Amino acid sequence: MGINREEQFLCNALAEVLAGKEPPHPEKGTDMDRVLELAYAHKVHPLLYECSDWEEVSAEWRERLKRESRKIVSQNYRLLFLTKYLTSVLEENGIGTAVLKGVGVAQLYPVPELRKSGDIDLLVSRKHLAKAEELMKEAGFAREEEQWTRHHVSYVIKE
């Protein structure tokens, strides 16, 4: 079973965008609404922002791409600020961290701000975990009541 025209176009467009190039225009008969539905389902739609002005893109999707991209950029700046804040608080207290996924992976994108992310993943050594948790509480974060896994601890910011 092969991939259809829309899936092939999405893969080609993403490859070009991630290489820092303009995405190709679709072949005649390519259903751009379907392409954008796929991109949205895989959370890579912000990478197709440049396509939003193409005539092949419906007005509904054009507006949605622009709106979603602006929202993602805003969320990412907030996450970037919080990441820098948390890592500096921890490092000032002798706790080294490694940033996983999110901000770190975004640097691989041609436009890092368009990498969709919803949280901050920090790796802290087990021996520093108790102190890190204390510092996060002092910084305005609260431990989530329900922890879904054993390999990490989830916090939310108190707002």
Predicted regions and their residues:
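Charge-rich, low-complexity amphipathic helices
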Residues: 57, 61, 112-113, 158
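Conserved catalytic core of two-metal-ion nucleotidyltransferases
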Residues: 75, 79, 83, 137-159
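Short, glycine/charge-rich beta-strand/loop segments that flank catalytic centers
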Residues: 70, 100-111, 147-155
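Helical scaffold of the NTase/Pol beta-like nucleotidyltransferase catalytic core
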Residues: 2-101
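Generic secretory/membrane-interface signal
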Residues: 1, 113-115, 146
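Residue-level detector of solvent-exposed, low-hydrophobicity positions
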Residues: 16, 51, 68, 116-119, ...
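Active-site nucleotide-donor binding segment shared across nucleotidyl transfer reactions
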Residues: 82-134
